[in-house]
UniProtKB/Swiss-Prot annotation:
PANTHER family: LYSOSOMAL ACID LIPASE-RELATED (PTHR11005)
Species this protein is from: Saccharomyces cerevisiae (strain ATCC 204508 / S288c) (Baker's yeast)
Intervals, Lumenal compartment: 1-13
Stretches assigned to the Cytoplasmic side: 35-548
Gene that specifies this protein: TGL1
Ranges annotated as biased composition (Basic and acidic residues): 502-516
InterPro entries: AB_hydrolase_1, AB_hydrolase_fold
This protein's name: Sterol esterase TGL1
Keywords assigned: Acetylation, Hydrolase, Isopeptide bond, Lipid degradation, Lipid droplet, Lipid metabolism, Membrane, Phosphoprotein, Transmembrane, Transmembrane helix, Ubl conjugation
PTM characteristics: Not N-glycosylated.
EC class (word): hydrolase
Reaction equations catalysed: a sterol ester + H2O = a sterol + a fatty acid + H(+)
Cross-link (Glycyl lysine isopeptide (Lys-Gly) (interchain with G-Cter in ubiquitin)): 246
Modification type N-acetylmethionine: residues: 1
EC number(s) on file: 3.1.1.13
């Protein structure tokens, strides 16, 4: 075995290596402990915190499944089982519309990040900071996915979870099977034409990969919101861990085996006191990613950190390490040779995200998130359909559990969905417009945008005969064909032949996109405050948004 970095390690680095081995030994020992003894430790921990049983954070922490978590907020959840094309059985969690009268005919599909499950969407201690609940209040049909191998999806028709074969999957399988098969199932049940997709962290990467591999899937998604999107992370904060991440896959398998990564974490969740467990998580996040978690309240950590880990394969972690090493969003490389990039007679295929995705995309990223390289990411996505929002002083996990996630993230998600509502495209101008109901909420009584190249003006007056009045100069009608072609290219469901594109047209499209980005940014900044929503309030998110 080749160890390229041992001669460069500091004392601290050696300590980390030793701790990794100690964890492996402890993990092996824990497997020998009888289940009744583990249950006893868990009971002792729960007993020691019994004085706080009535707090919302303790109720969420101790809730064993998403059903109990949502029940705390008087929301019911359905289980749906999806059989993938390679015979894994996945669990989808659905929060159905309140009633047919409240259903807005829109379906949203949310997908979690690495080492997570659907629980992470529903563990905010304040109701209005749980994105699925806000969408539910607004009349959406909400679905939450789960990757193969996590706590809700550990079944296969002929591969037992104890076998190595069950855990032989990477991001490739998530993209080829889990995401598209889940979306197909949702469409079949709900009978709608398209879904709105929202991904967090690796969930975003899985969706980017899935959309890039299937033109058919592009036709079935209307919007995509990527929260804390991961694609080609810069690297890990700690030198030794970053070196390990970029080493041979065989070296990683030597550390962690070929099944579940860090299987002992589940036992630590159950047997450590919440205060100690949360401290361990904060220290690990600081070492690995330099995250300080100042935007997540201590009470919130009690609820959220208990839901932070769910099982996945070592191979999927190795896949991320290969991406870190190559700095390319590529498919998994099976070769075990550390120097194969110099000797292999082939190239590893990259996910064709820049050319094959035809969906409006919003990137919401933290300004101090060490895992997101937004400039590299935007270069790997279609320039004319991607918009981005930076949340200053926010890290990775802050975007779903931060104290201001409602106003800084959720409200902008809602605005983006409405801004790019397919029903808001003017037939006359072929320009995308915000929905009429939401334009009325803008601070000024008149909202005007003049197109930089075509002189198209859009005005909204409260006294007009309709909430939204679009006026276009007749002299600019000759440009509509160009606008129409551009919008078809961005939002079409089939490939458009662009072989005859000239430089002038590319410049025009770039200007159009910049104007759309400017309009969208201003629109997102008009988001209402959703703070008045809480677990005991009957006020819905819709009421809050419409309230002056």
């Amino acid at each position: 075995m080749y160890f390229p970095f041992l001669g460069r390690l500091s004392i601290t680095d050696y300590i980390i290596v030793v701790l990794v081995y100690i964890e492996s030994i402890i993990s092996s020992v824990l497997k020998l402990i009888p289940q009744p003894m583990i249950n006893l430790f868990e009971w002792l921990i729960n007993f020691s915190t019994s004085s706080d049983d009535n707090t919302i954070e303790e109720k969420l922490r101790s809730a064993p499944t998403i059903h109990e978590m949502c029940a705390i907020f008087d929301i019911s959840v359905e289980d749906h089982l999806v059989r993938t094309e390679d015979n894994y059985i996945l669990t989808l969690h659905r929060i159905p519309p309140i009633s047919k009268n409240r259903f807005n005919n829109k379906v949203v599909y949310l997908h979690h990040g690495l080492l997570m499950c659907s629980d992470v969407w529903c563990c905010n201690i304040e109701r209005h900071k749980n994105l699925p609940f806000v969408l539910h209040d607004l009349g959406y049909d909400v679905w939450m996915g789960n990757n193969r191998g996590n706590k809700y999806s550990t079944a296969h028709l002929n591969k037992p979870p104890k076998s190595n074969k069950f855990w032989d999957f990477s991001i490739d399988e998530f993209a080829f099977f889990d995401i598209p098969n889940s979306i197909e199932f949702i469409l079949d049940i709900t009978k709608v034409d398209k879904v709105i997709c929202i991904g967090f962290s690796q969930g975003s990467a899985q969706m980017f990969a899935a959309f890039s591999l299937s033109e058919k899937l592009n036709r079935k998604v209307s919007h995509f919101i990527a929260i804390a999107p991961a694609m080609t992370p810069k690297g890990l904060h700690n030198r030794i861990v970053d070196t390990l991440a970029k080493s041979s896959p065989g070296f990683m398998y030597l550390f962690f085996g070929r099944k579940i990564v860090l299987p002992s974490a589940v036992i630590w969740q159950r047997t450590l006191h919440p205060t100690l467990f949360n401290l361990c998580i904060d220290i690990a996040n600081k070492i690995l990613f330099n995250w300080k978690s100042f935007n997540i309240l201590p009470r919130q950590k009690i609820a959220s950190y208990a839901k932070l880990y769910s099982t996945t394969s070592v191979k999927s972690i190795v896949h991320w390490f290969q991406i870190l090493r190559s700095q390319k969003f590529q498919m998994f490389e099976e070769s075990d040779n550390m120097l194969n990039s110099l000797t292999r007679p082939y190239q590893i295929a990259n996910f064709p995200t820049r050319t094959n995705i035809k969906i409006p995309i919003l990137l919401i990223y933290g300004g101090i998130d060490s895992l997101v390289d937004i400039d590299v990411m935007k270069k790997n996505l279609p320039f004319n359909s991607v918009f981005d929002v930076k949340v200053d002083n926010y890290e990775h996990l802050d975007l779903i559990w931060g104290k201001d996630a409602d106003t800084l993230v959720i409200a902008k998600v809602l605005r983006f969905i409405e801004f790019f509502n397919p029903g808001n495209v003017s037939v006359k101008t072929n320009q995308l417009l915000p929905s009429a109901s939401l334009v009325e909420e803008l601070p000024s009584t008149t909202w005007k945008t003049t197109h930089p190249t075509h002189g198209l003006s859009y005005r909204t007056h409260s006294a007009d005969r309709s909430p939204l009045s679009v006026q276009a100069d007749e002299a600019d009608e000759v440009h509509n064909a160009d606008n129409s072609r551009f919008l078809r290219r961005v939002f079409s469901t089939s490939a458009i032949d662009e072989d005859n594109e000239n430089e002038h047209q590319d410049d025009t499209e770039d200007q159009i996109h910049k104007e759309q980005q400017r309009r969208l940014s201003a629109y997102l900044e008009s988001s209402k405050d959703l703070r008045q929503l809480d677990a005991n309030s009957s006020t819905t998110a819709l009421d809050a948004l419409n309230k002056e």
